[in-house]
Structure formats: C-alpha cells, structure tokens
C-alpha cells in the first residue's frame, strides 16, 4: 500500500498574468508632434498598482509579467510571438485614453488568435465605453473605476475554476463589466477605492522588465532638466552642484479637479493619496 505520508498535496495553480500598456495613437500612425522613439513617458503607475495589490494579497510575483506595448511599439508578428511564447492565462490591457480603442481592437485580436482560451481584461479610461468595447472587440471583461479590488476579485474567480460559462458569478462584484448570454451589459456599479489607498513610487525594475530586449528605453522615464523650463529653476535646490541633469516625476493624486460635462472619468472627484 502506498505510504500516504509521502504524497504531496495538490496545490491550486495560479493563473499566469501579463499586464500590458497600450499606445494612445491608432495602429500605423506616428505621433504628429514628437518622435515616438525619443518622447518622454510617465510610468504607468496604474499597472504597477494592480501588480502591487495582487502581490500584497499573496499572489506570487513570479506569476505576473509586464509588456510595455506603448514603449516598444511591436509589430503584429512580434506581439503574436510574445503571447504564444509567454502563454498567459489572463492578459490585462491598460487603455489610458479613449484614443486607445483601435489599439485595443488590434492587440486583443492578436491575443485571441494566439491564445483562444485566455481571458482578455481591459482597464483604464476607455472602459467608460464598456458596452462598445465588449460588443465591438474580443475583450471578455472590463474593469471600471479603481482596478485593484475588482481585478483581484476576478483573479480569485479564475483561481477557483471560474470560466466564461460561469461568469455570471461575478454579476454582483463592483467594477466588473461583461456581456451576458443575451449580449446585454452586466454592471453592478463602480468599484470602491482600495483599502489603505496609496500611489506607489515607480518601480523602475518592473517597468524595465516590460521592455524585453530594449532595457535602455527605461531612460525615457526621466526628463532632462532643460525640458522643464523656468519653473524648475524657481526652487533654489535645483542649482545645487550635485543635482543630476534628469528629473523623475510621480503622481500624488487621483482624479481631476475639473467637472467637465463631456468627460467620462472613472475616478470620481479628486483624491490626494499617500
């Protein structure tokens, strides 16, 4: 008889996750007023915040990868090769502006072709138009509002065996949108802000990991002092001899102080965080 003491218990397998940033320009277009290969970028802290929240809730960091599509501008063939090789179970796309719609269509189609059974989840500003996104693209789920809590809830759903046939289990989860069997939008309301909300300091090693074989592009996260204009010089510390010629920027708030009637912001109001 087999000695059961020597049998290792079967542990639940964590799904592999790839988080991606998307360009705001349409496929095939160039930036009109800047060289896209040299333009300064602000780190997409929303993507990092999702990663940090998952890790803070005991999700293995090694199960999360990052692909900076916005910075790399890979071809369709390069994207397909990446996803076939990486083979994540869940791909999270970040669309910071509605301008990213055509990129969402492009990238999600490539993912669906390469990985027919994977989940494609969209977050960011574009999810204000979740009905259009879900009906006109192959995106499976939209995360509306602050994404940390609902994305974590979605991961838990997948970990316990949830499938596209049982997605109705998520109908009461705030911040999660999907289409039911009749093609109607299911949305129970905006997500709540994460507990102990904070905006992370940029993790440049994380952002560098998304640059694949072009780690030197991380330099584009640092803006030359001369590009800041006269405002920077108002601080006398800027004239200290030990100062380096580049500046890193980071966010200290969420939302916007404006109340434009035409804006579809998911983050309601203006919140200063730690």
What are these regions (language model features)?
Residues 2-5, 74-77, 86, 242-243, ...:
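Conserved alpha-helical substructure of the radical SAM core
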Residues 15-40:
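Short glycine-rich His-centered loop
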Residues 35-54:
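Short catalytic helix/loop segments, enriched in acidic residues and glycine
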Residues 24-26, 71, 127, 255, ...:
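Short, glycine/serine-rich, charged loops/turns that create anion-binding
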Residues 42, 205-274:
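Radical SAM [4Fe-4S] cluster-binding motif and immediate context
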Residues 50-53, 62-196:
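Glycine-rich beta-alpha loop elements in corrinoid/cobalamin-binding modules
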Residues 37-39, 94-102, 266-274:
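Conserved glycine-rich "GG(E/T)P / GGGxP" loop and the immediately following alpha-helix
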Residues 10-16, 243-246:
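A short, charged/proline- and glycine-enriched loop
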